[in-house]
C-alpha cells in the first residue's frame, strides 16, 4: 500500500510538471538594439537614489544566459520579455534607460528594482534586477556561496562570446566579467534607484542647430 502511494505521488508530480508552461526563447520573443557601453566610463546618474548597503564588497561578476529562464509565468520571464532589449553587439540585456540586466540575491529587492553599483575603479554600473539568485545558493541573500559573485549578468552568450571573448573552456570573459576593464573592481557602494529624475542631471544632445548666428545665440539659449 505504501509502495502504491509512492508511485501515485510520482505520477502526480510528473503530471503537474507537464502542465508547467515552459518555453524556449526565439528571436521573436525579444527585442534587439544597440547599447553603447563606452558611456559607462563617464556615466552620469540620471535618477535620484539612496543607500542600499554593500552586502559583500566582492569583485567576481559571473553570468547566465537569459534563455535559461523558460517558465513563461515567472516574473523573470515576463519582465525580460516586456522590458529588456538584447544588445546585438555585446549580448548584454538593457532596459529603456540603459540599465544592465543582472541576477541579484534577495538582499537587493525584487524583479524590476534598479541599482547603482559603484566599483573601486570609480565606475558606476546601472543594474536592473531581472533574475533572482536562489537563497539556497547564496549567503545572506547576497553573494554566491561558491564563487562569491554578487552581480551575475544576464546575457546572450552568443553575442557576448564574440564581443568579450571566450576562454579555452568556452566561458565568456573567462567566466568572470571582472576580467573586462569596464566591469573591473570590487563593489564599494550600492544605491537603490528611484523613478525620480535627479535635479542635478543634465542631458547633453548632439543635434544643435548649426545655423544659429551670434545675434540669436542669446534668444536660442533662453528658449525663444
Where would I find each of the regions flagged by the language model?
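Gram-positive cell-envelope targeting signals
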Residues: 1-34, 223-224
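Solvent-exposed, well-ordered loop and adjacent helix/strand elements within mature globular domains
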Residues: 27-224
Amino acid at each position: 500500500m505504501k509502495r502504491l502511494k509512492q508511485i501515485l505521488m510520482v505520477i502526480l508530480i510528473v503530471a503537474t510538471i507537464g502542465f508547467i508552461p515552459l518555453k524556449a526563447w526565439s528571436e521573436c520573443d525579444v527585442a534587439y538594439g544597440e547599447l553603447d557601453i563606452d558611456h559607462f566610463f563617464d556615466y552620469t546618474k540620471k535618477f535620484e537614489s539612496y543607500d542600499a548597503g554593500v552586502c559583500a564588497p566582492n569583485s567576481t561578476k559571473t553570468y547566465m544566459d537569459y534563455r535559461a529562464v523558460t517558465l513563461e509565468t515567472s516574473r523573470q520571464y515576463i519582465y525580460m520579455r516586456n522590458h529588456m532589449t538584447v544588445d546585438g553587439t555585446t549580448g548584454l540585456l538593457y532596459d529603456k534607460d540603459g540599465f544592465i540586466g543582472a541576477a541579484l540575491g534577495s538582499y537587493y529587492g525584487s524583479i524590476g528594482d534598479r541599482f547603482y553599483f559603484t566599483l573601486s575603479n570609480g565606475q558606476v554600473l546601472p543594474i536592473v534586477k531581472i533574475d533572482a539568485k536562489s537563497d539556497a545558493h547564496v549567503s545572506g541573500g547576497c553573494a554566491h556561496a561558491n564563487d562569491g559573485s554578487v552581480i551575475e549578468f544576464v546575457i546572450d552568450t552568443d553575442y557576448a562570446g564574440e564581443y568579450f571573448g571566450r576562454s579555452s573552456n568556452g566561458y565568456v570573459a573567462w567566466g568572470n566579467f571582472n576580467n573586462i576593464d569596464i566591469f573591473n573592481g570590487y563593489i564599494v557602494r550600492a544605491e537603490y534607484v528611484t523613478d525620480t529624475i535627479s535635479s542635478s542631471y543634465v542631458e547633453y544632445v548632439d543635434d544643435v542647430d548649426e545655423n544659429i548666428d551670434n545675434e540669436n545665440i542669446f534668444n536660442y539659449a533662453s528658449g525663444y
